[in-house]
Amino acid sequence: MAIQLVPASDRSSAVNALIKHIFDGETTLAVLAEDSGQPSNRLLGRGPNHPIVGGEQCHPLIVATSGSTTEKPHLVCLTTEALLSSAQATSDALGGPGRWITTLPLSHIAGIQTVVRAAVSGHSPILAPPGHFNAKDFARTVREARESTLPSVPLYTSLVSPQLAACLDHAPEALTSLDSVLVGGGFVDPSLTERAERIGARVIRTYGMTETSGGCVYDGIPLDCATVKIGSDGIILIAGPMLMSGYFDEPTPLSYEDGQAWFKTSDLGETTEDGTLKITGRVDDIIKSGGVKVNLRAVEEAALSLGAGMVCALALPDPTWGQHVALLVERDDVPTLSQKEKCARELREAVRDYLGDAAAPRTVAFTRQIPLTSLGKVDRTLARQQINDLIRQGDAWRR
């Protein structure tokens, strides 16, 4: 099986390769980030006896996962049928095909799908300016796209939370000029979607992953292509034609029930009274402190309810409790010692009031910027390094 490797940084080549792959599909394709040495080596090091997912005639798109909690990304094999199934379901959910503005990296499924959706709609994708996202530059791209697109053709984009926040703060007209804005990549602060709604922007929260060809649940409702259920352990399972065929160099994680393939996610969820899916955390978000289970995502949400900016809850080893909750808090200013202590105590009390003593943070540290991945997710590995560095420097509040 020949594998074509294309660097995501060469965006024009990546777009052309993706479109050719969708319509021709004669070669297995992988669009990789510049720093993806490990995935590249794994693909290039494929031995002659390596099993081919889907058989000799299958030429999948191989996409590396973007999770922030694993050192080794999975190499996900997606068939053209899976990608097209997802694209069609998105088109149906949004009210019809349209033109897409690509702001996200083409090494990630969210960025890739903007190209796929545009291509199958008969439109070329519009590439936003490269480099660090700038809301005003993005607004200019939207304005130019609107001017060059027929009024009858909807204009869409996909963003992550930090990009949405930047647009709300600096270029809200970019959001209101679009017919729909998909926002995924992890937890989306409800205050952001509320602000977007107040200015008349249509923002849709998406849930999905590389293994499901991208978002397959919009605002808590599964797309037509997706079937979602909650296992007895509270973990979300997903089925549908948009599922991957397997991992490139790992055993398949898919299970089968009555001939139906199911993917067991790493997310916890529940179905609300109105039938929507609510994500309550990740499996690895659940820790034990003093024998009591604590959901780190719930800790973050409680801290946000106090008006804190971006926060990251982590578990640190504790000689008494086994583990305790630590909070890394992002602030624009440089707080004084007394301000740090006051804020830390308020955060601890707020979380304790919401979730109980075991969830109350025993370590709180402040930073100008919480580290993020290229897709806008908190990089928990770097965040842990950051909070440990602050502790060693004596610059963290501890109880």
Write out the residue ranges for each language-model feature.
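AMP-binding/adenylate-forming catalytic core of the ANL superfamily
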Residues: 240, 268-359
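Conserved ATP/PPi-binding loop(s) of AMP-dependent carboxylate-activating enzymes
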Residues: 222, 231-256, 260-261, 282, ...
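Conserved pre-ATP/AMP-binding loop-to-beta segment of ANL
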Residues: 11, 47-64, 96-99
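Conserved C-terminal "lid"/linker of ANL adenylate-forming enzymes
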Residues: 287, 314, 326-328, 348-399
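Conserved AMP-binding A3 loop
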Residues: 58-88, 92-95
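Gly/Ser/Thr-rich phosphate-binding loop
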Residues: 167-219
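AMP-binding/adenylate-forming
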Residues: 27-28, 78-88, 99-166, 204
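ATP-dependent adenylate-forming carboxylate-activation enzymes
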Residues: 6-10, 32-40, 123-145, 294-299
